[in-house]
From Swiss-Prot:
One Pfam match: DBI_PRT
Origin species: Brucella melitensis biotype 2 (strain ATCC 23457)
Catalytic activity field: 5,6-dimethylbenzimidazole + nicotinate beta-D-ribonucleotide = alpha-ribazole 5'-phosphate + nicotinate + H(+)
Keyword line: Cobalamin biosynthesis, Glycosyltransferase, Transferase
Family: Belongs to the CobT family.
Recorded superkingdom: Bacteria
HAMAP family named among the record's database cross-references: CobT
Active site, per annotation: E306 (proton acceptor)
Entry protein name: Nicotinate-nucleotide--dimethylbenzimidazole phosphoribosyltransferase
SUPFAM superfamilies, A to Z: Nicotinate mononucleotide:5,6-dimethylbenzimidazole phosphoribosyltransferase (CobT) (SSF52733)
Length: 339
């Protein structure tokens, strides 16, 4: 803990002093790229992806050998306001489904040869109802961020982050509204299927929560504490830990992007090592990516969460790395280069 004794101070210091890019590694990749057996620039965004990998791993021939999907699960007190068609018990049931191998993310990880870890964040103790009280106190929020930092403990060279939590698109919308302004209508979408009266209650909950906590919302970490969820705090911690350990990150959908947005609001450079795997069908996600100046890799109309979009995008990143490291140069292949 910091000398001040305030749990967030250590994180504020960390966010201010994150390691920067390795421009030498990026330059080496770009220099090799023009020697490979293809017209310059013909692999399009794959060439930018491998340069990004080099920049944040510090490796001049970046590889992806141990990709990991980390899924964080949390429950939310705001679901008591009847904002979603599914009960919060579904969160724990889906965690069991992940463990049994029966969810979409399990199949995508199998298809793409990705590791999978699922983190159950005190599901029996939902966060506070954000329309009535703060989601967490500072100590709990900081401890949850620290827990999320342990996601990389087993070793990985590409981290995909995702989540599971009934009610958490409401939480993500509240965070986005607090960080970037606008109206609740700008950020609130159907989530797991909220329409009609459910949607009206969801909109009202977001408005009420942001109004209630307004005096605290100038500080992004306070936004996370007041309006966030344990899975969102843990994802923010995982993103920070990955930066410290030179591990690139692929962020999944709207909720995972809300975790990244908290860090972005504190320091826009804090998520430079992050790529956004997809743009969700949840309407607020496209707006959120635009606010952060991020372009997603995929647009497949998905809105499941679970890290599914990030996991699909991981295969593109793996392919980019292999194209760069495995392709022959013009000289090696005896192919004539362009004049």
């Amino acid at each position: 803990m910091s000398a001040s004794g305030l749990p967030f101070d250590d994180f504020r210091e960390l966010i201010r002093n994150l390691p920067g890019p390795d421009l030498g590694a990026e330059r080496a990749v770009r220099e090799r790229e023009v020697t490979l057996t293809k017209p310059a620039g013909s692999l399009g965004r794959l060439e930018e992806i491998v340069a990004w990998l080099a920049t944040w791993t510090g490796k001049r021939t970046p590889q992806v050998n141990r990709p990991l999907v980390a899924v964080f699960a949390g429950n939310h007190g705001v679901t008591a306001k009847n904002i979603t068609p599914f009960p919060p018990s579904v969160t724990a049931q889906m965690v069991e489904n992940f463990a049994a191998g029966g969810a979409a993310i399990n199949q995508i990880c199998i298809a793409n040869d990705l590791g999978l870890k699922v983190f159950d964040l005190a599901l029996e103790h939902p966060t506070g109802d954000i329309t009535e009280e703060a989601a967490m106190d500072e100590r709990t929020c900081a401890a949850t961020m620290a827990f999320g930092m342990e996601a990389i403990a087993g070793g990985t060279d590409l981290l995909c982050i995702g989540e599971m939590g009934i009610g958490n698109t409401t939480i993500a919308a509240a965070i986005a509204l607090a960080l970037f302004g606008g109206t609740a209508e700008d950020w609130v979408g159907p989530g797991t299927g909220s329409t009609g009266e459910l949607m009206q209650r969801k909109l009202a909950a977001v408005r009420q929560a942001v109004a209630l906590h307004q005096p605290h919302l100038q500080d992004p970490l306070e936004v996370l504490r007041c309006l966030g969820g344990r899975e969102i705090a843990a994802m923010a911690g995982a993103i920070l830990a990955a930066r410290m350990e030179k591990i690139p990150v692929i962020v999944d959908g709207f909720v995972a992007s809300a975790a990244a947005a908290v860090l972005y609001a504190a320091n826009p450079e804090a998520i430079d090592h992050c790529m956004f795997g997809q743009v969700s069908a949840e309407p607020g996600h496209r707006k959120l990516l635009a606010k952060m100046g991020k372009e997603p890799l995929l647009d497949l109309g998905m809105r499941l969460g679970e890290g599914t979009g990030a996991a699909l995008a991981a295969n593109i990143v793996k392919a980019a790395a292999l194209c760069h490291s495995g392709m022959a140069t013009f000289e090696q292949a005896g192919v004539s280069a362009s004049k």
